[in-house]
Amino acid sequence: MAAAVAGILRGGLPPRAAWLPTLQTVRHGSKAVTRHWRVMHFQRQKLMAITEYIPPKPAINPRCLPPPPKPPKEESGLVRLLRQDIVAVFRDNRMIAVCQNVALSAEDKLLLRHQLRKHKIFIKVFPSQVLKPFLENSKYRNLLPLFVGHNLLLVSEEPKVKEMVRVLKSVPFLPLLGGCVDDTILSRQGLVDYAKLPSLDQLQGQLVGGLTHLMAQTRYLLQHQPVQLTSLLDQYVKEQNEGDCATSANEKLHPPDPAPDA
């Protein structure tokens, strides 16, 4: 092959197509790998696990002591005062409504307070971090889902639901979320339905009218049979008297024949 290359370089003729060089390079394949990975014997695994090196833990510097325990946080006087106010509000009022405390102007807020105060309904605002712990430990815990964000309470000693709903309709941007009336938790729709009920005086009047009607009907039913029996007996006695009078009159008109002499 080297001679052919040298001849080409000297300008000679290229080798013939059938001519093969005397030296040829042959590329052999790689040798087979006989040491493939195999699963380690379980005894060797145990031995390796036992003899595994475990580095020691670094020593703790004695100056790196744990922090001292923090003293229990004492409640401030303001928190205790607010909790007392919350307890008094939920104890002394029969109606407690929850509304979302939206951003109202000073004029709108003053007008709303005035309209509610005419019906003896008052607005109370308490921080959530004081109000929520009280609700969690009281019978009003089901009101907790309503207290999201900033809220305000509409409270009244009497259940003035109808007046409250009428006032809130004039303030559509103050949403009503729910409330509690006479220890009964109601949703927003429940409060609206409660406001549609008639007043207590109307219900008492309807009850008295119904009872009076029932009493009159009962009295009529109790007296109807004796009166009818009395009228029938009077008619019977009258007919008997008329029959006796007719018999006596006939006897007078037609006296009996005298008995013949023997």
Swiss-Prot record:
Belongs to the universal ribosomal protein uL10 family. It comes from the Eukaryota. It is found in: Mitochondrion. Component of the mitochondrial ribosome large subunit (39S) which comprises a 16S rRNA and about 50 distinct proteins. GO terms for molecular function: structural constituent of ribosome. This is Large ribosomal subunit protein uL10m. The keyword Transport does not apply. Keywords: Mitochondrion, Ribonucleoprotein, Ribosomal protein, Transit peptide. One of its GO terms (cellular component) is mitochondrion. InterPro entries: Ribosomal_uL10-like_sf, Ribosomal_uL10_bac_type. Residues 1-28 form a transit peptide. GO terms for biological process: mitochondrial translation; translation. Residues 243-262 are annotated as: Disordered. The keyword Mitochondrion applies.
